[in-house]
C-alpha cells in the first residue's frame, strides 16, 4: 500500500489533542486526505481505493465524538460507491479529491455564517457565562467585540487540560473583559446566590455533538451548568454548525483515564471519569446555526431540509 505516514501523523495529532476543536479536526482530516491523494503515485484503482478507505477509517477513528468529521466521511463514501463499479483510477481520484475539497469549503463557509448570526445575540453590558474551549467560541465573541458591543465574559478553567487558560489570554489580548472561575464554583455564580451579586444574562455553550432530539454532548460539567441556568431561568444558547449533527446516533460518551482522578487507585476501586456529558433539550433556549436560530425541537427537520444527503447517508457501522 502507498505511504500513509502523513495520514497517520494527523491521526496522532488529533489523538494527542495537538489538533483540537471540531472544525479544525475535520478540516485537518479532509485537507490531508485530498493532499495525499494528489501526491501518491498509484498504479491501479485497487491500490488507490484501499489507500483511501484505510486512510478515511484511520482519520474517522481518531476521535469518538466528531460528527462533523463523520458526516464528511459519509459524504465522501456516498461519492465513492458509484466509482467502485467503474474501477477507473483517474475518475476515482478526481471524485474523492473533489468531495474532500467541497466538504472542506462547506465547513469554512458554514462556520462563517454561524458566527455572523451570533452578532444578534449578545447585547450591550451583558454578562455572559461560557464553557467549552473552541475556535468558534473565540471567533464568535471577538465578532461581537468588533461590532462595538461592550460586555463581560465569565468562563471555567476546563479541567483537566485547562484549555480556557489559552482562550482567556486571547480575549484579554482583544481587550475583552473576562473573569475565570474554578469549575466547581461556576453553578454557584450562575444561580445568583454568590456573594459577588452577579446576574448572568445568558449561558453560551459550544458543543461537540448534537442529537436528533436536540440534546447535546459536550465537555463534562456542561449538564450541571445548563441545569443550573434552566432552573434559574437564564437562557442557554448553543453555538452550532448543523454539519456536527449526530444523525445516526453514532456518538457515545467518551471516558478519560482513571489516573487523572487517582493515580494510587486501590485494586478493587472502580472510578468513573467521563470526558463528556449530555444536556437535555429542555435546558436549551436556542440553537444558533449557519441557517439562523432554531429551537431544539426543530433540529431534525432543519437538517432534513438543508442537508438531505446527511439524512440518507449510511451509519458508520454499516459502511463497507
Language model regions located:
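Ligand-binding beta-strand-loop-alpha-helix segment within the catalytic cores
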Residues: 77-124, 142, 151-199, 203
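Histidine-anchored nucleotide/phosphate-binding helix
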Residues: 134-146, 226
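Conserved phosphate- and dinucleotide-binding cores of soluble alpha/beta proteins
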Residues: 156-320
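Generic secondary-structure signature for well-ordered alpha-helical cores
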Residues: 16-19, 35-42, 57-64, 78-86, ...
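Long amphipathic alpha-helical segments
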Residues: 1-94
Amino acid at each position: 500500500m502507498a505511504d500513509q505516514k502523513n495520514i497517520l501523523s494527523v491521526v496522532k495529532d488529533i489523538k494527542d489533542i495537538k489538533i483540537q476543536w471540531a472544525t479544525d479536526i475535520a478540516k485537518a482530516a479532509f485537507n490531508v486526505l485530498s493532499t495525499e491523494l494528489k501526491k501518491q503515485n498509484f498504479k491501479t484503482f485497487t491500490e488507490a481505493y484501499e489507500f483511501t478507505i484505510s486512510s478515511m477509517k484511520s482519520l474517522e477513528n481518531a476521535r469518538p465524538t466528531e460528527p462533523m468529521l463523520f458526516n464528511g466521511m459519509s459524504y465522501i463514501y456516498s461519492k465513492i460507491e458509484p466509482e467502485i463499479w467503474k474501477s477507473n483510477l483517474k475518475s476515482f481520484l478526481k471524485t474523492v479529491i473533489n468531495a474532500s475539497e467541497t466538504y472542506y469549503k462547506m465547513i469554512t463557509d458554514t462556520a462563517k455564517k454561524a458566527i455572523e448570526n451570533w452578532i444578534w445575540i449578545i447585547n450591550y453590558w451583558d454578562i455572559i457565562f461560557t464553557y467549552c474551549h473552541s475556535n468558534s467560541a473565540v471567533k464568535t465573541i471577538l465578532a461581537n467585540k468588533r461590532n462595538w458591543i461592550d460586555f463581560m465574559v465569565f468562563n471555567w478553567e476546563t479541567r483537566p487540560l485547562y484549555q480556557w487558560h489559552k482562550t482567556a489570554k486571547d480575549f484579554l489580548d482583544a481587550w475583552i473583559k473576562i473573569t475565570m472561575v474554578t469549575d466547581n464554583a461556576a453553578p454557584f455564580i450562575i444561580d445568583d446566590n454568590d456573594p459577588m451579586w452577579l446576574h448572568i444574562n445568558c449561558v453560551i455553550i459550544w458543543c461537540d455533538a448534537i442529537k436528533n432530539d436536540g440534546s447535546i454532548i459536550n465537555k463534562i460539567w456542561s449538564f450541571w451548568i445548563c441545569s443550573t441556568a434552566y432552573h434559574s431561568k437564564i437562557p442557554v444558547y448553543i453555538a452550532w454548525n448543523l454539519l456536527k449533527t449526530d444523525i445516526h446516533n453514532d456518538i457515545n460518551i467518551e471516558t478519560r483515564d482513571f489516573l487523572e482522578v487517582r493515580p494510587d487507585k486501590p485494586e478493587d476501586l472502580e472510578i468513573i471519569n467521563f470526558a463528556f456529558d449530555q444536556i437535555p433539550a429542555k435546558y436549551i433556549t436556542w440553537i444558533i446555526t449557519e441557517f439562523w436560530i432554531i429551537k431544539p425541537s426543530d433540529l431534525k427537520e432543519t437538517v432534513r431540509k438543508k442537508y438531505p444527503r446527511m439524512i440518507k447517508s449510511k451509519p458508520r457501522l454499516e459502511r463497507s
